[in-house]
């Protein structure tokens, strides 16, 4: 609403107080990339996106160094790192930043191969949950239809 300069100052202050290199709760920083995109500051948005993705990649490198048993114990955290990268990539796609999307895809691709067993299991679990939700909705519709039918003479 014409207050782009003020918005940019607020974002800069937030980034100063929550520096990506030292602040471990990255999900709170992710929206700032989107805000920079909205302000037309694509370079700043891309910089945040790449920094956040690199933090998730650092986590994946850490898990890569573990044995299989330790990796299995940290499966949730491994998936969380991928979800972080996928959220960031989706935001860049939404803002039509194809160069950053390509860079992010290049960063994550090797780790998708390394952790394919976890990603495949996660995707399969998500598909099962979606199917269960679909069946529940179908049952609810059937129940509602039966209830309406039973009230009609």
Predicted segments — roles?
Residues 1-153:
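C-terminal luminal/periplasmic domains and tails of membrane-associated envelope-modifying transferases
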